[in-house]
């Protein structure tokens, strides 16, 4: 029989503020992560053509500096997203470069090994970072495990390179990538600015929780210990993916920016019809109709790999059909309400 005198206090998630912010500095780092990494090129809306143009534009000096610094560890650049915000101003690439030049080399390498992540903000965490930077092999492995900031090999590479050389290479890579690839291919500054401006009026009437869901198209975030602010940053180059990183007490969520094109079908309409035009995604929706599920549960029920499901879930989320709940564990579920396909199509072709 249950003990009727036993009570358990469950604390509510801590409050947080949500803020919209854009800048080409964010977009450049996200593009650099794509250029650096080895994820499937066709998983991005920009497609293989973007990668082909970027590779053709990049100099051998850029490629050499990049490989020396981070190898093919694309997500390593996410750890500098907070530095764009910290730099202030227009949050553009030049401001980021100026901020890095004015930073101590120790601060730059600390950020790149994950030292600004909340998991390492404690006294124990900072001691671990210090030991790793001093060259202790076990500390580097423990740092990678605790921060989840990539494999320990990537952290060891940075530590062996040294703080001053890491800073020099970081400046060279970001500067060259900006001049050779990012700017010539188009920074999308106007579209990014328009996305934030378009959401600003609605944002004033929303709670922080509502703004996160509204901006990201289906991410539910209730808050967590150590996070007091959520920075919502639009991105075009990484569509349909959402990038999530942390910087001290700030969670940074880079969501897909809207990019309407006059004369062409509404992008949201295209995404909805594309999402529904696949048997696997329809099975996913039916499974989620029964309740929220973790990725591992979906993989087991549908008999698919997690990597395959990630792609399908990204398409469904981009279409606004499902939501992702962030917390102790990530869960996927259906968003309230379903799109009226007849109305969407009728609006486009001009028939009531």
Where would I find each of the regions flagged by the language model?
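Minor-groove-contacting beta-hairpin "wing" of winged helix-turn-helix DNA-binding domains
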Residues: 328-335
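Helix N-cap / beta->alpha transition motif
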Residues: 104, 254-256, 334
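Extended mid-to-C-terminal alpha-helical interaction segments
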Residues: 209-211, 215, 220-324, 328, ...
